[in-house]
Amino acid sequence: IAKVVPEEQIIIGNTAFGATPMEPGHVKHTGTGVTNMGSLKAPKENVERMAEALREAGLEVCVHENVMNAIWHKLLANVAINGMSALLETKNGFVDGNQYAHEAARMLVEEAITVANACGCTLDHDAELEHAYEVSRMTDETISSMVQDVTHHRETEIRIITGAVCRLG
């Protein structure tokens, strides 16, 4: 985006919506979370204006001074859950509910936190780890998009999610 749009006009962030396909044409909504946003260079009033438009549409929005912390916060949960659930072809809750998956997720998150903090973020190890497990519990019946990709023999997001951490670290 920054190649064609001035950085002062770019607003970045993430959102959390869970869904699981039930059958062709039918999806079960499994959760709605917060939409996080901010900017590295855009004026704060532009970010606030965008946030207000999303709030008027019914979304819960949080504007962050350090949006990269919020982006890493969600990425850490994805690092813990998505790859592990795809590898084991399980629902999200298995990551927190199985001692071996729990431990593997801990190691993945710890490594990613080290990379995030080296990139200038200020993430609390214990809080981030607990958040990843909490997401696993809160979305325990969700079949992650990566599991769906494995099931349907499609390319997964592993290079985007865990691969991003590897490229930065």
Q: Where do the protein language model's features map onto the residues?
A:
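NAD(P)-dependent Rossmann-like dehydrogenase/reductase catalytic/cofactor-binding core
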Residues: E45, R55, R106-G169
